[in-house]
């Protein structure tokens, strides 16, 4: 494959601009099932066009076509975000009203922007890596964590939230959106991981240091303990804990946790049942040397938390959230400090694991013991 294939995917994704404009005007004249069928045909055509782009030298990695289609949908989501902000008009108006009305929520707005910016850049990078036959395992795992987190919160939230009674046929488009990332995640994880060529002496010296002699790791451990408590606390709020502290926090700090849209509740439950176990495992990995799996799970978790906190913070402050559920003006500084710190911590841990991995490398002695 050549670099022109990656450029072709980029141009193909931009075709979403005229396609959505035409699609919106045609959709206004047909019923919901016709809209779903037409949308499915469009996505299939995008995949076929991506195949035509690389017909002479097709890629070895079939995920090339998945990223091409998802890149197209990322531009669609960016268009939705711009239309919701009133910057453009007439591109997705009918679809937002009749197809997926839950995208009009503050949370829906934020994930559209995340998908149309962060995910879009990841797709372009991964497509370029495939075209140049380079490894993209690191950014791939980060993307897997990000998109899986959005699926875990967004799809159930559409069903159990206030829009649960307005589920339209377009909801079935979520099926490939859910299945393909899971399949992609397994393929990315099974790609060869990076080989670190550190001298055995260096690895042994690093792994011989206890936690007190690794100040940055010690700070990370303390922060992980605090983050675990924060996760459990907000998880209890999502479970309607009657404690006075939970009530006061919800009333004066994060009233958005009680939003009937259900996205914040599901997000807190995802933190409780996903992040808390991860934090416990990460604490173990920072204390016990040779946990070779730490970089991978840390990347996945960092991607998930980046998407989750971007969406949660944005939706908590967004004008589309009812005033009574928005963060009070006097609480914004504390709210932002807590939530930004909580979102940055996994990124710092991922950076530490990827760029200073000596402590996590399995030594030959460990392999012999196994």
From Swiss-Prot:
It comes from the Eukaryota. Keywords: Lysosome, Membrane, Repeat, Transmembrane, Transmembrane helix. InterPro entries: EXPERA (IPR033118), TM6SF1-like (IPR047195). The keyword tRNA processing does not apply. It holds the Pfam family EBP. It is a multi-pass membrane protein. Residues 60-185, 216-350 form the EXPERA domain. May function as sterol isomerase. Belongs to the TM6SF family. The keyword Repeat applies. GO terms for cellular component: lysosomal membrane. This is Transmembrane 6 superfamily member 1. The chain crosses the membrane at residues 3-23, 34-54, 62-82, 110-130, 139-159, 166-186, 218-238, 268-288, 331-351. The gene is TM6SF1.
